Amino acid sequence: MKKVKIFDLTLRDGSHAKSHQFTPEQMAVLAEQIDSTGVAAIEFGHGNGLGGSALQYGFAAATDREYMEAVAPVVKNADLSIIILPGVGTRHELHLAKEFGAKYARMCTQITEVDIAEQHIKMAKQLGMIPIAVLPCAGIIPVKDTVRYTQMAESYGAEVIYLLDGGGYQLPEQTYERIAAMKKAVDVPIGFHGHNNLQLAVANSKAAVEAGAEYIDCCLKGFGAGAGNCPTEIFAAVMDRMEIDCGIDLYKTMDIAEQYLRPLMPRAMEVDNDRIMLGYAGCYSSFLLFAQRAGARYGVDPRDIIKEIGRRQCTEGQEDICIDVAYALAQKK
């Protein structure tokens, strides 16, 4: 039977949806429950990764170390994963992750800037971790360029390479085409991370698996940036229907999502106007709350901010540019 590994990102991508205000105690309770569902790995921490707690992205409720101290002891079955935006997270964060037993170190850069991650990838490997390259915004460049940057990531030592659709912009056929091309071009496994701004996260994840992806990112109830991510319980049900083993206890996952996560969610992962715009414009989902706040501050429609961010092809870590965009739009009124 074909197998797929699920990385659960409820406690990391979901942090965006809580303005990074998970407490260490909440993370510990959720991590222990998620650990019992059968996921391959659990990723946790600030939404913008280790080192992300800052004025530009939003201060977290706790430090990286405090989250590590809370989560690491309670996870007994799944592996621990962290994500770093090179330049935001440094060697110090990698050493911290290693100290607490993280197995996977994921490096996320704009796909055209994957060379920025070279040092981080090599250091993670030196520390005995499994380095993963996460490449966003592939849907806005030609497939041949996606392949070229994938090969660069492999040459740096990445042992898994992810295609990340951070805006929920891609259509399933685009996802299939890119994953298939990546799979053919390199010798390491391929993963996919989708967002649900056009309600296509499950469809895109399914297309990725059909094209050969072996790793899929999910969150309980899809809890994540923008309109959320691929919901773990829905994706697990789809995989079961397709007779693909993803290791998930479906009933337990559904029950944990309802009992433990729902009470902590500020809102359901519905698709409203601004979230639709994220997917339509190809704007990274983590920009949503920043665009809404900047729009309110300057009297500008957040959709116009999101559209301009998509046009500029900004990526995660540049969220504070929403203020500049909103100010410029306000001056044109």
Curated annotation (Swiss-Prot):
Catalysed reactions, semicolon-separated: (S)-4-hydroxy-2-oxopentanoate = acetaldehyde + pyruvate
Residues annotated to bind substrate: R12, D13, H193, Y284
Active site: H16
Site positions (Transition state stabilizer): R12
Domain of life, per lineage: Bacteria
CDD domains in UniProt: DRE_TIM_HOA
Residues involved in Mn(2+) binding: D13, H193, H195
Domain Pyruvate carboxyltransferase: 4-254
E.C. numbers: 4.1.3.39
InterPro entries linked to this entry: 2-IPM_HCS-like (IPR050073), 4OH_2_O-val_aldolase (IPR017629), Aldolase_TIM (IPR013785), DmpG_comm (IPR012425), DRE_TIM_HOA (IPR035685), PYR_CT (IPR000891)
Keywords annotated in UniProt: Aromatic hydrocarbons catabolism, Lyase, Manganese, Metal-binding
One MF term in the entry's GO annotations: 4-hydroxy-2-oxovalerate aldolase activity
PROSITE patterns named among the record's database cross-references: PYR_CT
UniProt similarity note: Belongs to the 4-hydroxy-2-oxovalerate aldolase family.
Protein name stated in the entry: 4-hydroxy-2-oxovalerate aldolase
